[in-house]
Amino acid sequence: MYVLVLSLGDPVSRTFLELHPMPLVETRGDIEVRKYGEIPAVVYKGEPTEFYREDILASLGKYAIFISRHEMSNPRPLFTVHTPGSWPDVSVANPRLASALFRALCKHAYEPFECAFEATHHAPNTSLVSATFIEVGSTEAEWRDKRAVGVLAQALEEALTKEFEGPTPTMAIGDLHYVTISDSVLRGEFDLGHVVPKYINITTNIVENILKKHTISIKKTIIFRKNIKNPIRTEIIELLRAKGIEVTLKG
């Protein structure tokens, strides 16, 4: 069901591999297939955002989890979760998995680390499997910190052993890059899939596309009204309501 993706070009992936040596199962071209407990793990020589062998992921599981570093302009110790997507296309989002990982990260985070749920951003874009990034930020010190990277393993162990029956599958449109509704996810008010950030050109076509790119049907959408101008805001609301999706306006 699950498959881990680790990239040798990524320092967090390398630290994770130091902590958790994984036996080699087979090699497919430049891709190694290893085993993390009972979960297949793909080890790739490049960067996480450059991974291109979705066919290998699809042969091993349905839900891919990328182990990765997090970078930001004003670095601070941070654990993050997000779905990848280089707009206007995106990966398949997994609201249940992403939200479970986020809650587990927050549970196991320790000072000075904080946790954040990020808007959908950067490659790769998937269509056959869901993709979820789980990250440690935001400098070399944190990327190589075995205790910090060990929190990712704790979150994986906790999240992947849970039954994924959860609250309302929800997406958000027009939020900030570091989403402002993460506390609601933490409290279990809903499970969050794609978050369309306010800084992209938001269109009805994008909304139509991301609705199709979730592992479960979206039942609710949170729209940040001040960040989406009319007439496009009204068009998006009408589109969602016509599909029977609950719309909540914020701001």
Swiss-Prot record:
GO terms for biological process: D-amino acid catabolic process. Its cofactor is Zn(2+). Keywords: Hydrolase, Metal-binding, Zinc. One of its GO terms (molecular function) is D-aminoacyl-tRNA deacylase activity. Its EC number is 3.1.1.96. SUPFAM superfamilies: AF0625-like. It catalyses: a D-aminoacyl-tRNA + H2O = a tRNA + a D-alpha-amino acid + H(+); glycyl-tRNA(Ala) + H2O = tRNA(Ala) + glycine + H(+). It holds the Pfam family tRNA_deacylase. Gene3D superfamilies: AF0625-like. Binds 2 Zn(2+) ions per subunit. Coiled coil: none annotated. Signal peptide: none annotated. PANTHER family: D-AMINOACYL-TRNA DEACYLASE. Monomer. Belongs to the DtdA deacylase family. D-aminoacyl-tRNA deacylase with broad substrate specificity. By recycling D-aminoacyl-tRNA to D-amino acids and free tRNA molecules, this enzyme counteracts the toxicity associated with the formation of D-aminoacyl-tRNA entities in vivo. This is D-aminoacyl-tRNA deacylase. It comes from Pyrobaculum aerophilum (strain ATCC 51768 / DSM 7523 / JCM 9630 / CIP 104966 / NBRC 100827 / IM2). The lineage of its organism: Archaea, Thermoproteota, Thermoprotei, Thermoproteales, Thermoproteaceae. The gene is dtdA.
